[in-house]
Amino acid sequence: MNSLKKIILVALAVAISSILIFKENSLVAKLTFPVQAAVSQSLSCATKPDIPWLHTDGRWVKDERDNLVTLRGISFCGFNNEWGEKVLPDFEHKIAKVTDETNGWYPNILRLPIKNYHLDTFSLEQVYQTLQAGVDECARQKVYCIVDWHVVDGEKGADWRSPQMQQQTKDFWRYMAPRFKDYPNVIFELYNEPGYPKLVNAENWLNWRRTAQEWVDIIREQAPKNIILIGSPLWSQITRFAPKYPFTGSNLAYVNHTYKGMEESWPQEIGLEYDWEEVFGKAADRVPIFVTEFGWQADSEWEFGKGTTANFGRPIKDFLNQRPNINWIVWTYDSYCSPRLADERDRVLGEKKMGLFVRDWLQEEWVKSTNPVKPCSTCFADLLNSAEGK
């Protein structure tokens, strides 16, 4: 990336010099005068452009000019350290690590999880202050962020069907949505992983929709513009029903989570193999999809996620690269969750772990046209295209 920046600076210098050397009616001058007129725009790339509001349109996310957008990034795990829910996450500090280009990280979105049982220790206002620090840091770094209500059904008795969890979810969004409604970089993730019942059928999806639609409405009434991400039962795996039975509302997208080993939890009686194309690929042909969790680690402590770059990382990369309308977020940067990108000293993990592979992948994606926060390289390319009348 550093060599690319040097090339861009040299190209700018040559363009400006040519204006002084060539006559106004020369071919080179005709190409470079528009560039000179837009030099200030190019230089503004060095400070990163403002983040545009996003919206959904068909199967795509788009920016305010209707440019196609793909969001690709990293999730934190919701804990600050081994003390778990007894300490709120230090998002501001974490974000600085993974948006520093000198560290080689190039996400355009970060996921900020808040566990439901954080509220056993902290007030909604305290949780909001923690999230606000993270959201503000993301805004400063010009990256999008997901405010993630990170309930995992089955964890400490959580169950989306219980009156207690339904009330807690409504309380959370009534508090958070109006406070983040004016942030163009904020996306809301409704409920991380509804778990039960473990059925892959339309009835299960429709029962979930009947309950969760009220939560969507609460957010939309308070925050009319922010995209809302909607999961599904079986820990956000029955995404395939979203196109036929969508939720009501604007700027909605649907979530899938996938890990090595999830095929073992996939009900065999439905007569359908666990296959990315069937699980969420076909849905992505019709509605916007965010894979807000996936990852792999050969020695993962977790029952799911035990995979290698060869048997999971490269296949999922190939699958997602063929479908640029699917947005994706890798789980997780933090060393005290699994699978992980880095260790406790922020050393990026390689070999059979995913850190180096994902970091290189994000660098590749950063310069693509679907990145809504364009880097300097694409800013200058746009200027040249403009000068050539493209």
What are these regions (language model features)?
Residues 1-11:
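N-terminal Sec-pathway targeting helices
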Residues 9-19:
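Hydrophobic membrane-insertion alpha-helices, especially the h-region
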Residues 31-109, 360, 378-389:
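N-terminal carbohydrate-binding accessory modules
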Residues 53, 78, 87-90, 161, ...:
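Extracellular glycoside hydrolase catalytic/binding regions
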